[in-house]
Amino acid sequence: MKFQMRKCKECGEYTLEESCPECNVKTGVIFPARYSPQDKYGKYRRILKRQQMEK
């Protein structure tokens, strides 16, 4: 089992659980994705960024 620090988006409580023990809302992982030089989704990110800049 892999434990990752998680944070509730509603109340800001930190936990290791999938849902917040205080307000029972689904929590999110607070760490960014691991860096890889072989960026699989870089092409799509650049396309999206270019589209947003054109607006």
UniProtKB/Swiss-Prot annotation:
Keywords: Ribonucleoprotein, Ribosome biogenesis, rRNA processing
Alphabetized GO MF terms: snoRNA binding
GO cellular component: ribonucleoprotein complex
Pfam family, one: Nop10p
Gene Ontology BP, a term: rRNA processing
Highest taxon, organism lineage: Archaea
InterPro entries per the UniProt record, alphabetical: H/ACA_rnp_Nop10, H/ACA_rnp_Nop10_sf, Nop10_arc-typ
Biological role stated in the UniProt entry: Involved in ribosome biogenesis; more specifically in 18S rRNA pseudouridylation and in cleavage of pre-rRNA.
UniProt-listed NCBIfam families: PRK13130.1
The family this protein is said to belong to: Belongs to the NOP10 family.
Stated name of the protein: Ribosome biogenesis protein Nop10
Organism of provenance: Methanosphaera stadtmanae (strain ATCC 43021 / DSM 3091 / JCM 11832 / MCB-3)
